[in-house]
Amino acid sequence: MTSPFKVVAVSGGTYRPSRTLVLTQALIAELGQSLPIDSRVIELTDIAAPLGATLARNQAPAELQAVLDEIESADLLLVASPVYRGSYPGLLKHLFDLIDLNALIDTPVLLAATGGTERHALVLDHQLRPLFSFFQAITLPIGVYASEADFDNYRIVSEPLKARIRLAAERAAPLFGGRSELLKIA
């Protein structure tokens, strides 16, 4: 048996309950259907205070340093962000400002985002993808965007969103030798 792949998920929301966290957890669960994974979820809200007070990596408290090390050592990074005013939160960007410049080279990154309406869906390609291209990470071609209409009481109720989550996980699996039925899009 192969050892599990280390999936580190960053949920970029700062509120609870959080649709971004629900989407993150759904993606992890679906990845676990195709791959042996060991996952860790980092919630931005849990590290917001020490993160905001850290201006440079060498000033990071031990708790935050451990989070940065986890992100840098991921086999697969899942980054999910809420969308505020057309982009991801500044605190999420600040987290990645503290990541070593070369740490994410060739690391697969699955991108996800949540927003109020579909008009923010392009944040995946116009905001998040360029950030991880800078790190020379491998952003997976299929990202997952969810709007408020896809949820009811912080539960995913949209069948198209559920299908998109399955598709994203199935497309990620072959990168790690996992099984994939490779759903075809008509």
Swiss-Prot record:
UniProt xrefs under InterPro entries: Flavoprotein-like_sf (IPR029039), FMN_Rdtase-like_dom (IPR005025), FMN_Rdtase_MsuE-like (IPR019912), NAD(P)H-dep_FMN_reductase (IPR051814)
Enzyme class: oxidoreductase
Domain of life: Bacteria
Catalytic activity: FMNH2 + NADP(+) = FMN + NADPH + 2 H(+)
Known EC number: 1.5.1.38
Keywords, sorted A to Z: Flavoprotein, FMN, NADP, Oxidoreductase
Gene3D superfamilies per the UniProt record, alphabetical: 3.40.50.360
Molecular function via GO: FMN reductase (NADPH) activity; oxidoreductase activity, acting on NAD(P)H, quinone or similar compound as acceptor
PANTHER family noted in UniProt: FMN REDUCTASE (NADPH)
UniProt similarity note: Belongs to the SsuE family.
Designated name of the protein: FMN reductase (NADPH)
Taxonomic source organism: Pseudomonas aeruginosa (strain ATCC 15692 / DSM 22644 / CIP 104116 / JCM 14847 / LMG 12228 / 1C / PRS 101 / PAO1)
